[in-house]
Structure formats: structure tokens, C-alpha cells
Amino acid sequence: MGADATGDTAARGDRAAHGDTASGGATGGTAGNIATVDLHPSLLPLAFLVGTWRGEGVGGYEGMESFHYGQEITFAADGRPALGYVSHTWWADEPRDGREPGSPMATETGFWRVQPPATEPGPDGKVNGSPVVEVMLAHPFGIAEIYVGTVTGTRIDLDSNVLIRTATAREVTRSVRLYGLIEGGDLAYAIDMEAGGKPLQSHLSARLHRSPS
């Protein structure tokens, strides 16, 4: 949904991200070398995200020709208990369907929050001791999403909890996201989507480099 609008998301983190997100933690940078002067204490598990990331990814879906896109994501801290989030994507493929390289594609805006780890057992009977992540996103094509998941080291697993759409928006019924740091300190992600009556499947994945401050 992030490029123009995941199945096992983790298995596809290396498809277009060109690397593997680590299980539980990731190789590369850590929060220790990120300036966190404006970071609310509750957001320390997400400190590794703070800053601007830029790179390229690949997208596709059943019935859709695959495509490449460029992306810039900014996670901003201002002292409050939520990271501000803005993502912009643009066409990075050959001209097609009226799109030229650099043509704007999609925008996501929202906030990321962290809650204490769950204390009650989940469906598997186990207590997940990882901090809970809540993500709220809005899209200009008529959809708003709330994701709930966990952060373990520098890996974040998210599943859509609420999807709201306008009467004219396309039908999206579920979205699953995986974010994580990979080798070299890059940020990789993969997004699976269930939409239009089609099963949950790979939609987007990318590898982003941290932009200089």
C-alpha cells in the first residue's frame, strides 16, 4: 500500500530489499549511535528508526505488472510519546501507463507509538515479552490503517488491526508489514496485502539507506 496504494513477509524481506532482516535483531546499526535528544523515553525501542531513509523498492500484486519505485521515509521525534512518520514514493521504472520516472506515486502520513509488553498469554499460550508497537497511517486514496505488532531488537512485525476506507476507495482487507535493520545499517521492509478478494500476498519491499543529517 505504501507505493501505490503481505503470506510470509519475513521470507520476502530479501526479495527487493536485497538483504535479510534478522530474526529478533538485525545486523548493522543500533540505537546507540542515533541522536535521541528529542526522543520520549517510551520510544527508545524505536530509536533506530529516527531520521530520514531513502532508497528503492519493487512492487507488484496478482494481476499487476511488477514495478520499481523510489522512496523517502522520515521518522521524527519531538519529545512527545509518538514518532511522526511521512513516506513519499515515486515511479522509478520505464515510462508506463502515463507514468514517467520521478512521477509521484503515494504518500503515507501517521504516527508510531510504543506500549509496554503484553502480560497476558497470546493465542499460542505464551506471553510475548516484546514491546507493543501501534502504528496509525493515512493514505490520500481514501484509506486509514491501524497496525499493532511488536519490536524485538531492530525487527518490527505489524499486522493491520483496523482498516477504514471511504465509499470510493478500493477494498483492502488486511496488510502485514515487516521492518528491520540489515547489513550495513540499512532499513528493509516487506508489505503483504489482502485486497479485492485476493489472498494475502507480497505487495511491496524495499531497501533504504539512512540519509546524512
UniProtKB/Swiss-Prot annotation:
Heme-binding protein able to scavenge peroxynitrite and to protect free L-tyrosine against peroxynitrite-mediated nitration, by acting as a peroxynitrite isomerase that converts peroxynitrite to nitrate. Therefore, this protein likely plays a role in peroxynitrite sensing and in the detoxification of reactive nitrogen and oxygen species (RNS and ROS, respectively). Is able to bind nitric oxide (NO) in vitro, but may act as a sensor of peroxynitrite levels in vivo. Keywords: Heme, Iron, Isomerase, Metal-binding. Pathway: Nitrogen metabolism. This is Peroxynitrite isomerase. It catalyses: peroxynitrite = nitrate. Residues 1-26 are annotated as: Disordered. Its cofactor is heme b. Belongs to the nitrobindin family. Residues 1-10 have a biased composition (Low complexity). GO terms for molecular function: heme binding; metal ion binding; peroxynitrite isomerase activity. It comes from Parafrankia sp. (strain EAN1pec). It comes from the Bacteria. It is an enzyme of class 5 (isomerase). Its EC number is 5.99.-.-. InterPro entries: Calycin, Nb(III)_bact/plant, Nitrobindin, THAP4-like_heme-bd. Forms a 10-stranded antiparallel beta-barrel structure able to accommodate a hydrophobic ligand in its interior. In fact, this fold hosts the heme group, which is located in a wide surface cleft. Coiled coil: none annotated. Homodimer. Binds 1 heme b group per subunit, that coordinates a highly solvent-exposed Fe(III) atom. A motif (GXWXGXG) lies at residues 51-57. The keyword Heme applies. Heme b binds at residue 203. Pfam families: THAP4_heme-bd (PF08768).
